[in-house]
């Protein structure tokens, strides 16, 4: 996902936001950078249940064994949250994704306390789905 910040830069950029409104706008800007999904990726298997908005997450592995992400949402803020999650898992293998708890990163970004309960539940559903898909990729 060329052009997206890495984890450290993401945290730095969030810390530079003066208030929650700026963070919200930054998340929306991140979402706008997601390339569109193909029709093949926009299949029911990639639709994440537990999200109020429609969210698709497709995962595959590169020749180096790293997970490659593609995703989309019909809601701008949720699309941005998809990108944030992808950034946190970027460059990892399926096993590393299974082992990594990204929740502390959301605490570092001060995102968790500013999301509505339904968005927090959706974020949790995305994380669970990514870890489950990583387990399937690992199993081959």
UniProtKB/Swiss-Prot annotation:
- Keywords recorded for this protein, A-Z: Cytoplasm
- Subcellular location, in the record's words? Cytoplasm
Q: For this UniProt entry, which residues form the secretion signal?
A: none
Instruction: State one Pfam family annotation.
Output: SufE
Q: What is its main location?
A: cytoplasm
- Record keywords: Transmembrane included? no
Function per UniProt:
Participates in cysteine desulfuration mediated by SufS. Cysteine desulfuration mobilizes sulfur from L-cysteine to yield L-alanine and constitutes an essential step in sulfur metabolism for biosynthesis of a variety of sulfur-containing biomolecules. Functions as a sulfur acceptor for SufS, by mediating the direct transfer of the sulfur atom from the S-sulfanylcysteine of SufS, an intermediate product of cysteine desulfuration process.
Q: Can you name this protein?
A: Cysteine desulfuration protein SufE
Per the UniProt record, the source organism is Yersinia enterocolitica serotype O:8 / biotype 1B (strain NCTC 13174 / 8081)
Per UniProt, what is the name of the gene that codes for the protein in this document?
A: sufE
């Amino acid at each position: 996902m060329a052009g997206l910040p890495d984890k450290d830069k993401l945290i730095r950029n969030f810390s530079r936001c003066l208030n929650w409104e700026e963070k919200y706008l930054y998340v929306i800007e991140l979402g706008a950078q997601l390339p569109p999904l193909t029709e093949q990726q926009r299949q029911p298997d990639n639709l994440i249940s537990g999200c109020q908005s429609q969210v698709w997450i497709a995962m595959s592995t590169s020749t180096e064994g790293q997970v490659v992400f593609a995703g989309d949402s019909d809601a701008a803020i949720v699309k941005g949250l998809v990108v944030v999650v992808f950034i946190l898992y970027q460059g990892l293998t399926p096993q590393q994704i299974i082992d990594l708890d990204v929740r502390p990163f959301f605490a570092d970004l001060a995102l968790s306390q500013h999301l509505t309960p339904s968005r927090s539940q959706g974020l949790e559903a995305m994380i669970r789905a990514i870890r489950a898909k990583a387990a399937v990729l690992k199993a081959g």
